[in-house]
């Protein structure tokens, strides 16, 4: 997929598989925007993933913990860090690839009007065996210190309401256009035949 910018809707994708696909695309020169990162899924129960995250939180520099490693709590940064681990980010090529990535919780304004994609090979419903446990990244992030879950939920509700209203208007206009085309079909039959002849 090579386009100017690809917007990926992360809802229902498995974290590792999504990150691997995006890392490959970034290294190939594709610009990627990941939205709705709080809806990413991780295989394994919430309890198990919390234990793993708390083990990760213990990893720090003895003499000065402020020097790293840094433990990001927001879903967008967790995805960013996962992708960073799959890219040679200390080389100029890897650093340039990481610059091509943007990740957001929710769907912020410029991207709410753009076509969003999914990645089939990373979708949980296609990859995880039914009945297996999984958890949502937003919930995990909230339980380890992310404080903006409520705000993102509120903004997403507003966006979905506006989107539903826009879709209803669009559907009405499409129906009106279809009716108008049927109404004038008999009058424009000769013209349409001529246009068909020329491939329009």
Swiss-Prot record:
Name the UniProt record assigns to this protein: Large ribosomal subunit protein uL13
Molecular function via GO: mRNA binding; structural constituent of ribosome
GO cellular component: a single term: cytosolic large ribosomal subunit
Keyword Ribonucleoprotein: yes
Gene3D superfamilies according to UniProt: 6.10.250.3250, Ribosomal protein L13 (3.90.1180.10)
Origin superkingdom: Eukaryota
Record GO biological process: negative regulation of translation; translation
Keyword Transport carried by entry: no
HAMAP family: Ribosomal_uL13
Pfam families: Ribosomal_L13
PANTHER family in the cross-refs: LARGE RIBOSOMAL SUBUNIT PROTEIN UL13, RIBOSOMAL PROTEIN L13
Keywords, in A-Z order: Ribonucleoprotein, Ribosomal protein
Species this chain originates from: Cyanophora paradoxa
């Amino acid at each position: 997929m090579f386009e100017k910018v690809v917007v990926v809707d992360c809802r229902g994708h498995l974290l590792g598989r999504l990150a691997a696909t995006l890392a490959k695309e970034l290294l190939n020169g594709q610009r990627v925007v990941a939205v709705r990162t709080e809806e990413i899924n991780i295989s394994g129960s919430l309890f198990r993933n919390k234990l793993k995250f708390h083990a990760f939180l213990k990893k720090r520099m003895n003499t000065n913990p402020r020097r790293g490693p840094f433990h990001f709590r927001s879903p967008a940064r967790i995805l960013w860090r996962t992708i960073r681990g799959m890219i040679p980010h200390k080389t100029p090529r890897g650093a340039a690839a990481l610059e091509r990535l943007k990740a957001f919780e929710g769907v912020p304004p410029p991207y709410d009007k753009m076509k969003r994609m999914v990645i089939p090979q990373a979708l949980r419903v296609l990859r995880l065996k039914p009945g297996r446990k999984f958890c949502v990244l937003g919930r995990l992030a909230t339980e380890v210190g992310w404080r903006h879950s409520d705000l993102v939920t509120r903004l997403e509700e507003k966006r979905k309401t506006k989107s539903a209203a826009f879709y209803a208007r669009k559907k009405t206009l499409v129906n009106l256009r279809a009716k108008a085309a049927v109404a004038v079909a008999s009058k424009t039959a000769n013209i349409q035949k001529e246009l068909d002849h020329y491939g329009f």
